[in-house]
């Protein structure tokens, strides 16, 4: 909420060919400017997903398969993991990003415009409710509990073994 001292990491690329002076927006090819060295998980949210072949398939020292089987299975594991991830992201990344965006926007809106005003209203009203509750307790509940306590205190039980 104060003065921002860090530079924002924002880049804007305009091509002379793709920028139209007539008001029509033509975007440049994003692959042209893709930075393959950029860290896509800077906060290490998914560091636990770095799974290698040796983390999944392991043969003890006493039982080994043939070297060619081991090499082929390792290659097949890596290729299938790579291809399936690319395939799934092509079909699922954009729809899931859209759904996640809608979900987070909805939750943010509910939190900002409904939940926090409700909480603040409750906190403003609580002193009045506390005063009323104390009065109800002093006028109704305390005398009732005192009467019931006095009534039960006059009861005595005597046990006899016959």
UniProtKB/Swiss-Prot annotation:
Name of the featured protein: Caveolin-2
Cited function: May act as a scaffolding protein within caveolar membranes. Interacts directly with G-protein alpha subunits and can functionally regulate their activity. Caveolin-2 may function as an accessory protein in conjunction with caveolin-1.
Intramembrane-annotated stretches: 87-107
Pfam family, one: Caveolin
A GO term for molecular function: D1 dopamine receptor binding
Organism domain of life: Eukaryota
PTM-bearing positions, type Phosphotyrosine: 19
Coiled coil (UniProt feature): none
Family: Belongs to the caveolin family.
Chief location bin: Golgi
Gene Ontology biological-process entries: basement membrane organization; caveola assembly; endoplasmic reticulum organization; endothelial cell proliferation; insulin receptor signaling pathway; mitochondrion organization; negative regulation of endothelial cell proliferation; negative regulation of skeletal muscle cell proliferation
Assigned GO CC terms: acrosomal membrane; caveola; caveolar macromolecular signaling complex; focal adhesion; Golgi membrane; perinuclear region of cytoplasm; plasma membrane raft; sarcolemma
